[in-house]
């Protein structure tokens, strides 16, 4: 987290992106009719502040990104990371620290440890989406089940089951029987 794009989001303007070329929206609006009548209106891929990751970065060896729109410029993907199509997404200032399977969303400033799996539709909240500006770290060899959601750090070797949400204020209670079972296996 020593190099980051904190504050960039507020300073950058939305642009129309045609491939890796940004075009100012005000210029497009001012020239729209002339461009359309001359057949030169661009085929716009997206409107955003950041380009797509693969438009400017060559992914590390053994890294797979199955849809170019799923990783934003400013993300960091370690070698061996796989970003699947569908609900997968990695935002700027976010990324992986080793081989990670990404089938869910890694929001801004969230970091996922090696060997972890962000299950289909799972969400890791970012500094722009519900963490009060505190970056979330997911430990190594951790599973975030399908459609789970976390807005707080989770350590190594944890499982957040499918559909479960855990936030900084979430209270967790264990029965005496569950505590005894945990003591037995630990």
Language-model features, listed with the residues they occupy:
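Short, positively charged
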Residues: 55-64, 133-135
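Proteins with a high burden of low-complexity, intrinsically disordered sequence enriched in S/T/G/P/A and R
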Residues: 2-6, 12, 30-32, 37, ...
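Short, Lys/Arg-enriched charge-dense amphipathic segments
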Residues: 24-39, 120-128, 147-152, 156, ...
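Generic secondary-structure boundary/loop-capping signal
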Residues: 47-54, 62, 68, 74, ...
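A structural motif detector for beta-strand N-caps
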Residues: 63, 69-71, 75-77, 81-90, ...
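C-terminal segments of enzyme domains that contribute to small-molecule binding surfaces
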Residues: 131-135, 140-143, 149, 165, ...
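Terminal amphipathic alpha-helical/low-complexity segments used for targeting or macromolecular assembly
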Residues: 1-59
